[in-house]
């Protein structure tokens, strides 16, 4: 372990990388972060690496592709590349699963990871995205790789009504590819104390085709899909210190893609869409509902030196997958998750002197998560899982001489999961026969653990800010997957222990001159038990539970030599190793479904005349050749396929006609590069070997009032 930490530190010392202004994160010294400590604080007070994707960046990326998974792959180093489909399978953060939030409401379904949590909101309603990288327990279950928090737009201004209207079209140079999107945002104050914000968005996509004009695979395809998003926020200021706010955010997607599937050959011929489908699906693919309700109360002066924040929330999520003959008699599966939660957050000032100040943030989180995976015909694929999590926490923060920030915290996880009795599904084996269904007796599972974090940030001067931290996460990840493949007759015989991740991070950031910003970060994360998909001898997927180590580096450079131009980029690299027999031998690598290839993001943005902005983004994914194929068959197993490198350029531009009107346009895959996304290669399956989207254009018109 010491050798690993030293090697990562050495690599970080010689790695200088880049970060973009419109496509990547730019850290302003006064930038505010909400997610890191569950309160507003300057980014200069955070002892770890944070990526903030601003509203300006989101709007810029919208002119290229409105899929939030695509936006994030171009803006977040160490986040794996997008699949280009409705699933975010394989899109890990620093090699581990990420917890997705909308205004602090958990969207992820860690009890049975449906891989559709990142794509759970329309980007038009997002004000900013905060990405906390590395294991953390600050928001509870599921954040082994970090947190992605979508912070939605809020009421602003003193007008009774103001807003933003957008309409746009997308398409390729092929018949049937035309798509449309429209969004409307309204905000204002009805009275001096009562404010509101409301948003509606709709998008209809056309057919999606590769660089040769061939329809992409219909499996988990975003083509011919209706996407809906709505938001309503109502706020009332009781007085200068107290505020209550109620909000609803809803998202839904539904596909009517009637396209047949022509399965290709892995590494040779891509799987494509062709002809008409067999209409075996009884329910359209997509996410029929993602309802989020939240009621919050803020009191900035509950008593002397103490503030209080209370959040009560509900989430109702359902997503549906395509037809599969994996099951006996075939079928479509779904994931249903219903969450109820409360967060109680106190913030007490301990002291405040000229040279130091201290505060303690403390409270408790309560979460009930009911998750199940079934087939649309009613058969259970996982049992009903009912989790209750009660977690008190405390975080102490000390600021010395306005230069040194010290943080330390503890969180006690108390988790109980009720598992119902169930019969396992008969699924197809490699020889064409089906597994035998067995009855599994349910029961209660209970987990308890104390996890913590400690970190520092020393702001020497604008040129050098050092930070370092140790943090832990605690998660019950993929319990449903473990249960549904059970060969035991009772859950007590299964390996269902939680994952505790220890994350170590060391980095430096600063502004060398007024035109050059940088950041360098190295990290190591360890866990006694992981959860990785591996392929069994009959080619079915199973969860491997084994000790793991993931380590890597990332960094960025951002140049602004003149007011009319900026450029830069970022680089991220990681490696992961495991000990399958838990014997101290870490010569086995974690497969590519978790460990993504090194990634370079680069950009240039030019403003040649007033109101006009023109930019070019580049994503370069390096190749991966970490495993050898089977010596007899020449085939790779799942997650171990060789991944070739590829480079994609995107063009984007906008023109401010006046204070009210703006037009914008973008071209995705500018050079019409023919390539396959990483998942097509590392999955090593014929059905997953698909091409990526060819050149596609977007034109948008915006009106602000």
List the model feature ranges, each with a label.
Residues 69-109:
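Extracytoplasmic beta-strand/coil segments of soluble accessory domains associated
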Residues 105-133, 182-184:
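Short acidic/polar hinge/loop motifs at secondary-structure boundaries
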Residues 121-164, 704:
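A beta-strand signature from Gram-negative outer-membrane beta-barrel systems
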Residues 175-205, 214-258, 289-291, 352, ...:
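Transmembrane beta-barrel wall of Gram-negative outer-membrane proteins
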Residues 205-209, 217, 221-227, 237, ...:
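Flexible loop and strand-edge segments within Gram-negative outer membrane beta-barrel domains
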Residues 307-325, 459, 465-477, 481, ...:
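Membrane-embedded beta-barrel scaffold of Gram-negative outer-membrane proteins
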Residues 474, 620-629, 654-705:
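C-terminal beta-signal and adjacent terminal beta-strands/loops
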Residues 519-526, 544-630, 671:
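Gram-negative outer-membrane beta-barrel transporters
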């Amino acid at each position: 372990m010491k050798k690993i930490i030293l090697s990562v530190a050495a690599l970080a010392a010689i790695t200088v990388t880049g970060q973009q202004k419109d496509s990547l994160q730019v850290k302003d010294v006064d930038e505010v972060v909400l997610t890191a400590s569950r309160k507003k604080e300057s980014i200069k007070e955070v002892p770890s690496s944070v990526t903030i994707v601003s509203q300006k960046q989101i709007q810029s990326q919208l002119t290229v592709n409105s899929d939030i998974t695509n936006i994030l792959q171009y803006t977040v180093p160490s986040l794996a590349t997008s699949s280009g489909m409705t699933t975010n399978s394989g899109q890990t953060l620093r090699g581990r699963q990420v917890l997705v939030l909308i205004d602090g409401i958990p969207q992820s379904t860690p009890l049975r990871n449906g891989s559709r949590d990142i794509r759970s909101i329309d980007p038009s309603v997002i004000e900013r995205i905060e990405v906390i990288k590395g294991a953390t327990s600050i928001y509870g279950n599921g954040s082994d790789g970090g947190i992605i928090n979508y912070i939605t737009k809020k009421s602003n201004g003193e007008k009774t009504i103001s807003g933003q209207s957008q309409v746009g079209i997308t398409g390729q140079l092929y018949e049937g590819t035309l798509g449309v999107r429209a969004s409307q945002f309204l905000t204002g104050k009805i009275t001096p104390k009562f404010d509101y914000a409301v948003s509606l968005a709709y998008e209809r996509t056309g057919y999606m085709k590769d660089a040769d004009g061939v329809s992409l695979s219909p499996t988990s395809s975003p083509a011919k899909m209706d996407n809906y998003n709505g938001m309503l926020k109502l706020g009332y200021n009781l007085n200068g210190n107290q505020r209550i706010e109620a909000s609803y955010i809803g998202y839904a997607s539904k596909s009517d893609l009637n396209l047949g599937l022509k399965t290709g050959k892995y590494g040779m011929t891509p799987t494509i869409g062709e002809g008409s489908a067999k209409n075996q699906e009884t329910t359209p693919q997509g996410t029929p509902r993602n309802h989020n309700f939240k009621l919050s109360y803020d009191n900035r002066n509950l008593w002397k030196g103490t503030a209080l924040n209370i959040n009560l929330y509900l989430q109702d999520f359902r997503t549906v997958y395509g037809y599969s003959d994996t099951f006996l008699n075939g079928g479509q599966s779904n994931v249903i998750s219903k969450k109820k939660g409360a967060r109680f957050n106190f913030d007490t000032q301990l002291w405040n002197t000229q040279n130091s100040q201290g505060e303690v943030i403390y409270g408790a989180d309560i979460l009930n998560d009911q998750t199940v995976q079934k087939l649309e015909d009613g058969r259970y694929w996982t049992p009903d899982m009912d989790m209750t999590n009660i977690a008190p926490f405390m975080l102490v923060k000390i600021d010395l001489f306005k230069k040194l920030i010290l943080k330390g915290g503890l969180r006690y996880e108390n988790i109980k999961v009720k598992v119902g009795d169930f019969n396992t599904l008969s699924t197809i084996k490699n020889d064409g026969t089906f597994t035998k269904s067995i009855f599994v007796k349910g029961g209660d599972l209970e987990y308890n653990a104390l996890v913590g974090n400690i970190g520092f940030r020393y702001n020497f001067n604008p040129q050098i800010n050092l930070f370092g931290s140790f943090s832990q996460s605690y998660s019950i990840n993929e319990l449903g997957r473990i249960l549904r493949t059970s060969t035991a007759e009772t859950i007590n015989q299964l390996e269902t222990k939680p994952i505790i991740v220890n994350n170590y991070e060391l980095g430096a950031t600063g502004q060398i001159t007024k035109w050059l910003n940088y950041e360098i970060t190295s990290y190591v994360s360890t866990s006694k038990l992981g959860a990785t998909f591996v392929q069994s001898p009959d080619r079915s997927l199973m969860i491997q539970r084994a000790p793991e180590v993931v380590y890597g580096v990332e960094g960025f450079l951002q140049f602004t030599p003149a007011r009319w131009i900026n450029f830069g980029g970022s680089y991220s690299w990681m490696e992961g190793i495991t000990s399958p027999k838990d014997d101290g031998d870490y010569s086995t690598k974690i497969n590519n479904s978790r460990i993504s290839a090194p990634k370079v993001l680069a950009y240039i943005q030019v403003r040649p005349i007033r109101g006009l902005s023109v930019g070019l983004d580049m994503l370069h994914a390096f190749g991966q050749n970490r495993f050898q194929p089977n010596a007899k068959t020449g085939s790779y197993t799942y997650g171990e396929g060789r991944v070739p490198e590829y480079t994609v350029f995107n063009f984007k531009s906008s023109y401010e006609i006046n204070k009210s009107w703006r037009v914008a346009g973008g071209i995705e895959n500018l050079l019409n590069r023919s390539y396959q996304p990483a998942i097509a290669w590392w999955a090593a399956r014929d059905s997953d070997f698909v091409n990526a989207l060819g050149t596609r254009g977007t034109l948008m018109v915006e009106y602000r009032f």
